[in-house]
Amino acid sequence: MTTDCAFLENELYDVARLFPERPEILTHSFRFENGKFYNSFNVDGEEYSYADTAPFSGELQFKRKEKLFAKLRLYSILSDKYGIKMPWGALTGIRPTKLAYREKEEGRNFSDLFSFMGVSEENIALTAQVLNAQEGIYEKNEENADYFVSLPFCPSKCEYCSFITAPIDKTRGFLPPYIACLQKEIEASAPLIKNLRSVYIGGGTPFAVPAEDLGKILVSVDKIRKNDCEYTVEAGRPDVFTDEKLRLLKDHGVNRICINPQSFSDETLRKIGRKHTAADVYRAFDLSAKYGFSVNLDLIAGLADETLSDFSYSLSESVRLAPDNITVHCLCLKSGAKLKEETSYLDAPVVSDMVALSREFLPGNGYRPYYMYRQKYQAGNNENVGWSRKGKECVYNIDVMEEIADNIAVGANAVSKKVTFSDGKITRHAAPKDLKTYIGKIDSIIAERNEFFGR
């Protein structure tokens, strides 16, 4: 694919890769003339030309319109060529709700733009439901911040996983210096915090870390968490749950945990490299129940050879356990995932049926969608949706997905974000991915992040 407009190259590629077939020839040219956005395409020898008009003010709005029309016109060509309509139409960004909020803030109905871009009525309704669920939580305030602690250790690596995580058995030698550096970084970050909205300890599987080391991190977080804000630990796989670790969380004010079975099929769990069974999930819930945590449970649609019936059973079992949150992810195979190396395609129709089932089943059992996001290489061009009982929505997930608060992130592979509302800019500061480099550079990492936040 070639284009004479460099900043559109990736955008147009993202549209093209929505489709299971790709044109052998795809060229694009753009010009703006006499108030019109002209886009011309050559797709496998067929010529297409479009002229669109729209009001804009300033360079930023011009770029947005330029991108919108180019993506829409290419999507229309390929949709007609292959006879396929995508559920999100020409939208390829990972945050549909963020675009919807922007339309609302500029005095427009977001559904008009979404319809124009070919988004299905079902997804327009889903977006509206998410925005409605976020009322009273969504807040733009320059002083707001969320806090992320990275514990990038797991019992083993799942077949579908692309995260930079380390099997705990192979990295125990790094654990003592890593914990010490993480404590130092957490405590040095105290001056960065003004209004703390939430704390999230993730990874990885934080419960893969020994209780003694987990306790050290919780003590350090106590020093920077000066209010009773939401406090989540993504405990993770149910086979690493212990009463000792759960009691530690309760003693340090943690009020929300994540249990991540992904499926209630023992056969599926075996295929994806999990070392636990569905029975371990029930045990983890039983252990957690006496501590009164708000619980999120993760499922993945599209796992190895799962049928709609398998996924339906996982949904039913999840609802039977009655967590406050259920998050339904669609399988997404990125570089670094073993399954991506072994699989050339995902069964998009089956995954789409699973998504449709979750949208029908969960609202009927007291859950509503409160946040969502999309990813590249996602089965069926679908989305990940967090479902919640009313009043139990996760602040951290909303803030991070809508990018409406600074994110102070500590630990290896942690990415801090600074949000500036005046110009809409979001800047990032990434820590080293590997443990050895992180440990060796901890002092410079602390100094750079403090400078990044201007403290």
Please place each PLM-identified region on the residue numbering.
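Canonical Radical SAM [4Fe-4S] cluster-binding loop centered on the CxxxCxxC motif
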Residues: 142-177
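A C-terminal junction/extension of Radical SAM enzymes
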Residues: 25, 332, 336, 340-410
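Conserved non-cysteine loop/helix-boundary elements of the Radical SAM core domain that shape
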Residues: 165-357
